[in-house]
């Protein structure tokens, strides 16, 4: 293990939740998240629009579009929050910087949250958003999917569905510190179990709300690490050294390579979980966006 970056250590001192996430009800966790959200100043002032997509049951799925729709590549973004909390405003600054810095249109997805809407309903929302973005924003060209933490899980799972159904809508996947497995026994879980933003107990709590039955954790569209990965789109996998999810993310990248999928793995040493979408890490966030831009240029332009 290396050393925690000094600015990451400073962030952790002020980012301690008032109550451990795992000790709260979902409603309490959502309230705590909103209360602890810090203003993200300095993000580019770019064009945005909110759109409601009809679901088959007559309800609507909200998405937010960043950038001017035209010939630019499209990335569909899924926020983090352990499938339990989060909304379109959670990563608004990141989506603005991503659109501006990578020269893409971003479609951010307000997918349904658990436990009110458990697996596979959030994934169904992800796939609906991908289908709409592919048709309406990209003009039938392949889109990319990108997500942080639980959102990274949805990004990967949407690729699996796209492959299984033969729809060919996704041309690039970018999981950021993604959840890939309903398992908690590896080196990074043990080494980073507590005190580093995301804890092992938090992850057990998140999974407990996402799955109606623990047995669903073996489903390869939930535990994407257990899926057949052959035929998935090219990947840029981002991990953080001081993250319980580091090892499962890196295992996912290695399995993609073994399956013949063009993949790159970038570990950010000294960083903590979800750093890429946090405004507290502007230098690292800019590096991630540059990495994303390079992948987009290779696979989507």
Where are these regions (language model features)?
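The serine-hydrolase catalytic nucleophile loop
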Residues: 82-96, 248
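Catalytic nucleophile-loop/oxyanion-hole region of alpha/beta-hydrolase
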Residues: 87-88, 94, 102, 107-142, ...
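Short beta-strand-to-loop junctions in surface cap/lid or active-site-entrance loops
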Residues: 63-72, 225-230
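Structural signature of beta-strand start/N-cap positions in the alpha/beta core
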Residues: 74, 103-105, 142-144, 171-172, ...
């Amino acid at each position: 293990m290396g050393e925690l970056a000094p600015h990451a250590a400073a962030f952790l001192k002020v980012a301690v939740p008032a109550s451990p996430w795992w000790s709260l009800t979902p409603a309490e966790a959502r309230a705590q998240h909103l209360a602890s959200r810090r203003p993200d100043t300095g993000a580019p002032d770019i064009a945005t629009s909110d759109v409601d997509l009809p679901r088959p049951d007559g309800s609507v799925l909200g998405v937010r579009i960043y950038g001017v729709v035209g010939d630019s590549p499209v990335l569909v973004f899924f926020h983090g929050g352990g499938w339990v909390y989060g909304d379109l405003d959670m990563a608004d600054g990141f989506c603005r910087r991503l659109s501006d810095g990578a020269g893409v249109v971003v479609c951010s997805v307000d997918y349904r949250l658990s436990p009110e809407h458990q697996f596979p309903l959030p994934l169904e929302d992800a796939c609906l958003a991908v289908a709409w973005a592919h048709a309406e924003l990209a003009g039938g060209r392949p889109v990319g999917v990108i997500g942080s933490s639980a959102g990274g899980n949805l990004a990967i799972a949407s690729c699996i569905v796209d492959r299984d159904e033969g729809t060919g809508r996704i041309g690039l996947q970018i999981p950021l510190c993604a959840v890939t497995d309903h398992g908690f026994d590896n080196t990074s879980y043990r080494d980073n179990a507590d005190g580093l933003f995301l804890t092992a107990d938090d992850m057990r709590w998140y999974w407990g709300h996402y799955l109606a039955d623990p047995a669903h954790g073996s489903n390869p569209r939930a535990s994407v690490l257990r899926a057949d990965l052959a035929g998935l789109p090219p990947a840029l996998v981002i991990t953080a050294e001081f993250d319980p999810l580091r090892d499962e993310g890196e295992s996912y990248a290695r399995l993609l390579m073994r399956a013949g999928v063009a993949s790159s793995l970038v570990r950010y040493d000294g960083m903590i979980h979800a750093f890429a979408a946090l405004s507290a890490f502007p230098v690292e966030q800019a590096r991630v966006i540059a990495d994303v831009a390079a992948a987009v240029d290779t696979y989507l332009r």
